[in-house]
Amino acid sequence: MTKFETVRGMKDYIGIDAEKIRYLESIFRDLAIKYGYSEIITPVVEEFKLFALKGGEELRETMYVFKDKADRELSLRPEITPGVARAYIQNLQSSPKPIRLFYFGTVYRYDEPQYGRYREFRQAGIEMIGDSSILADLEVLDLLYNFYDKLNLSNDITIKINNIGVFRKIMDKYNIEDNLQEHILHLIDKNKINEALDILEKNIKNKDIIDFFNKILTKKDTKLEDIESLAELEEVSRLDIKSEFLYLFRLSRILSNLNIKFKIDLGFVRGLAYYTGLIFEVLHPSVQFSIAGGGRYDKLIELYGGLPSPAIGFAIGVERTLLVIKDLKVEEPVNVIVIGMSEDAIPSMFMVSRILRKEEYKVVINTKDQPLSKLLPYYASQGFKLAIIIGKQELEKNMITVRNLITRKQISVPLENVEDAIKQTL
């Protein structure tokens, strides 16, 4: 007989594991709505070139790419931001700005599976399109911080920040083409600093600039006053990047006033090719990888054929976030089992179940043909707190019996008084 299992790098989530994912989703959704964001749901399947246009053909090696029957090259999305950008151009470009959108969905990457890395995983994220202000950046960071605060993780996490605009402006000044810029930033992201500097040296041919570049890359935990000092350096003025450092100084000072724990890492870049300014990642001491990240991508929408539109967003790794939560207790409704002792009891079983479900109780109707002496201990072992019993005597008197399966306390009441009886027995 053929035996089927999950595809490598993918996982089934059953029972409490599925509930934890839905719990995080509900926390994130409620928070995003309170910040004024509207939900967007985009297709899992997009044209491959949507991702390759900025990320390059090498993305093919880490994606699920295929052709449909019309010979169109499609892919399972490896992230959600490009799909949101495409949807914005297609549906929302003429709407008042800024546009605030949030999402929750699955993404797919053909990576080597390991702890914290899956081929199918979930992202929760936001995108703010049409606003280039520092207030927009702060709102996004504040929302991200508050999400982790609601999970009681705000004291543990650190938000690592940088301004990738520093690197972009230096490379633009020396006419380094976009594809080579992405390659250099990719090398820095992979901590291949010497390789990146070698390429820069061949293209810039100015030792002072290379030394300055190297100096920036080594500043992994930069103090606020150091940023202010850097902004006054002669090389910074000559390279026309003073505004990039001053922006980072302003942002950091306000984050400090908001009591958001962060660190400035001037050597930090993110692997995605479309970032233009602020970039950030959420770090937790219990894991070696980031659990969320994002940044500003002011040129992506124009690249896709839309009008120039500044934008910023982030994506939370849902499974990665669950890995760092020690004791996530999902609040569950009281479990109730309804047991009828004869076929005549069936209408009453469904009536009482309807009443309780309207009041948010979790109600299951017993389908086992076994004596009560076996059913009660069985359901107690399965986590049910209460049993509603409808036997011959109860039917004759139009009553029900409510029994607490833990304390064994029970009372009999008219069916319409079932809620009061439950409160008395809990």
Swiss-Prot record:
InterPro entries: aa-tRNA-synth_II (IPR006195), Anticodon-bd (IPR004154), His-tRNA-ligase (IPR015807), HisRS-like_core (IPR041715), HisRS/HisZ (IPR004516), HisZ (IPR004517). PANTHER family: HISTIDINE--TRNA LIGASE, MITOCHONDRIAL-RELATED (PTHR43707:SF1), HISTIDYL-TRNA SYNTHETASE (PTHR43707). Disulfide bonds: none annotated. Its main location: cytoplasm. It comes from Saccharolobus shibatae (strain ATCC 51178 / DSM 5389 / JCM 8931 / NBRC 15437 / B12) (Sulfolobus shibatae). It is found in: Cytoplasm. One of its GO terms (cellular component) is cytoplasm. It comes from the Archaea. GO terms for biological process: histidyl-tRNA aminoacylation; L-histidine biosynthetic process. Its EC number is 6.1.1.21. Keywords: Aminoacyl-tRNA synthetase, ATP-binding, Cytoplasm, Ligase, Nucleotide-binding, Protein biosynthesis. This is Histidine--tRNA ligase. It catalyses: tRNA(His) + L-histidine + ATP = L-histidyl-tRNA(His) + AMP + diphosphate + H(+). One of its GO terms (molecular function) is histidine-tRNA ligase activity. Pfam families: HGTP_anticodon, tRNA-synt_His. Belongs to the class-II aminoacyl-tRNA synthetase family.
